[in-house]
Design a protein with these regions (language model features):
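Conserved acidic-Pro-Pro-aromatic motif
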Residues: 4-5, 133-136, 203-282
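Residues that act as N-cap/strand-start positions at coil-to-secondary-structure junctions
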Residues: 60-62, 170, 190-192, 263, ...
Length: 282
C-alpha cells in the first residue's frame, strides 16, 4: 500500500479497551455544546476540515464524550479521529440520500447487510426501520464491535448482529491498515501473520441464516471486488440484494469487478452521492 497507510495502533483496534459502560445519557450535551452543535449544523462548519476541529472543540467543552441521537438512534461520540463521528454529530442530513435509497420500499421484516459498519451509521437506522428483520453489521476492526453493540443497545435494538471480521474471496488472516489517522478509513492487508480473521460473505450469510437480503451497503476501502463479486455470482436469486449502496473509487467510476457482476445480474445504476453509487435490481 502507499505510504499514507500505516498499521493500526492497539488503541485504534483493541475492542477490550472499550471500558466506558456508563449509562447512555451521562454524556448528553450541555447548553454551550448544544449551541455550538446547532451553529455547525446550520453552517459550513459541519463540512471539510472544519468538522474535525469543531468536534474536538465541542467535546472539550464538556466531559470529553457526547451521547447524541441521529435518525432516532443513539450514538456515543468519543472524539477520536473518525469522520463518521463528525457527520453524526454535526450534519443532520449526513448520508441521507444513501440511507433513504436503501430503505425505500422496505418493510418491517427486511434484512440488511452493512459491510464496513464502523459504529453503526447505516446499521442502526436500517435495523430500526425493520424490527422484525435482521441487520448484520460486519467490520474488520475489533474496536468497532464494542462501539456498535453499545450504540445498538442504547438504541433499544435487538435485531443487530455484529460480525468482527474482514471479508474477501477466501478465508485467511489479515493486518489492518489506516489512512489519514482516521479509524473510518481502514483497509486490510492479507497476511499469514495477521490477527484479523478473513471470511467470505457467503459463509457469513449462511451462518446468519438469511433467506433474503433487501439492502446491502459496502465500504471497505478498495476490497469491494474481492468481497462482493464472489457472493453475488454464486447467490440464489432470493439472496441477491434488491438495493446496493457501494463506495465508488472516483466520482463517476465504480469498481470494475462489481460493475460486471451488476450488469450480469440485472442491476441498474440508480444514482450517486458524493461517496457512493446506488444500484437497484428491479
Amino acid at each position: 500500500m502507499a505510504d499514507i497507510w500505516r498499521d493500526l495502533t492497539l488503541q485504534e483496534s483493541d475492542g477490550s479497551l472499550f471500558s466506558d459502560q456508563s449509562q447512555f445519557g451521562d454524556y448528553r450535551p450541555n447548553v454551550i455544546q448544544n449551541l455550538l452543535i446547532s451553529i455547525c449544523k446550520a453552517t459550513i462548519l459541519k463540512r471539510g476540515l472544519f468538522r474535525g476541529r469543531m468536534t474536538s472543540l465541542i467535546l472539550a467543552l464538556g466531559k470529553g464524550k457526547l451521547d447524541i441521537f441521529f435518525r432516532g438512534c443513539a450514538y456515543r461520540i468519543f472524539g477520536e479521529n473518525n469522520l463518521i463521528e463528525y457527520g453524526l454529530l454535526l450534519n443532520p442530513k449526513y448520508n441521507q440520500s444513501d440511507l433513504d435509497f436503501l430503505l425505500a420500499g422496505s418493510d418491517s421484516s427486511s434484512n440488511f447487510l452493512d459491510i464496513g459498519s464502523n459504529i453503526g451509521l447505516y446499521s442502526l437506522p436500517l435495523a430500526k426501520s425493520a424490527p422484525k428483520g435482521k441487520t448484520i453489521s460486519i467490520d474488520a476492526n475489533p474496536k468497532m464491535k464494542a462501539r456498535l453493540e453499545f450504540n445498538a443497545s442504547a438504541s433499544g435494538l435487538k435485531n443487530v448482529t455484529m460480525v468482527s471480521s474482514a471479508v474477501s474471496d477466501k478465508v485467511g488472516t489479515a493486518r489492518l491498515k489506516i489512512r489519514k489517522d482516521d479509524v473510518a478509513i481502514v483497509a486490510i492487508e492479507e497476511s499469514a501473520h495477521g490477527d484479523i480473521p478473513i471470511r467470505t460473505l457467503s459463509d457469513i450469510v449462511k451462518e446468519q441464516r438469511l433467506t433474503s437480503i433487501y439492502g446491502l451497503k459496502i465500504d471497505i476501502e478498495g476490497h469491494e471486488d474481492r468481497a462482493l463479486v464472489p457472493f453475488l455470482m454464486s447467490a440464489s436469486d432470493e439472496l441477491l440484494p434488491k438495493r446496493i449502496v457501494i463506495e465508488h473509487p472516483q466520482a463517476d467510476q465504480d469498481y470494475p469487478g462489481c460493475v460486471k457482476a451488476f450488469a450480469a445480474l440485472g442491476y441498474v445504476l440508480s444514482g450517486r452521492s458524493r461517496n457512493n453509487s446506488f444500484y437497484l435490481r428491479p
